[in-house]
């Protein structure tokens, strides 16, 4: 399924999961769910998060990236794509792992939404205490 010059990585963040395919001989095209990165992410911060691993090694214009992402919101999807792209970069060249680890991209952010508990308004918000 994955071609010789393609590298695959799976990324997850919150409730989002991304499948990232990276082609090493590219021109800098980043396609997310069949749309350009500028069309898919309206927020500049989300675009910056996605491009962080590539900018670390000045590879933004050297590779093509094709992504399918589902679940969650804008921030979670951007984080999932970054994690998947990091995994794909490590398959491309294992020597990049040290710098990616130092930048904090390798570790999966395990924080998820805490569940609502019975008797509370939200996950931790208690009902107002009344002395009398």
Curated annotation (Swiss-Prot):
A GO-annotated cellular component: cytosolic small ribosomal subunit
Keyword field contains Metal-binding: no
Top-level lineage group: Bacteria
Alphabetized InterPro entries for the sequence: Ribosomal_Su5_D2-typ_SF, Ribosomal_uS9, Ribosomal_uS9_bac/plastid, Ribsml_uS5_D2-typ_fold_subgr
A GO molecular-function descriptor: structural constituent of ribosome
Sorted UniProt keywords: Ribonucleoprotein, Ribosomal protein
GO biological process assignments: translation
Alphabetical list of Pfam families matching this protein: Ribosomal_S9
Family per similarity comment: Belongs to the universal ribosomal protein uS9 family.
Record NCBIfam families: PRK00132.1 (NF001099)
Protein name: Small ribosomal subunit protein uS9
Source organism (scientific name): Baumannia cicadellinicola subsp. Homalodisca coagulata
Lineage, highest ranks first: Bacteria, Pseudomonadati, Pseudomonadota, Gammaproteobacteria, Candidatus Palibaumannia
């Amino acid at each position: 399924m994955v071609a010789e010059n393609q590298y695959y990585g799976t990324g997850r963040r919150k409730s989002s999961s991304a499948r990232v395919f990276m082609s090493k001989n590219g021109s800098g095209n980043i396609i997310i769910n069949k749309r350009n990165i500028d069309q898919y992410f309206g927020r500049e911060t989300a675009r910056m998060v996605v491009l962080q691993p590539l900018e670390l090694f000045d590879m933004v214009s050297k590779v093509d990236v094709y992504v399918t992402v589902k679940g969650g919101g804008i921030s979670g999807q951007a984080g999932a794509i970054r994690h998947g792209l990091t995994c794909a970069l490590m398959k491309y060249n294992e020597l990049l792992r040290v710098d990616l680890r130092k930048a904090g991209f390798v570790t999966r952010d395990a924080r998820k939404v805490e569940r609502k508990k019975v008797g509370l308004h939200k996950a931790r918000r208690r009902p107002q205490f009344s002395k009398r």
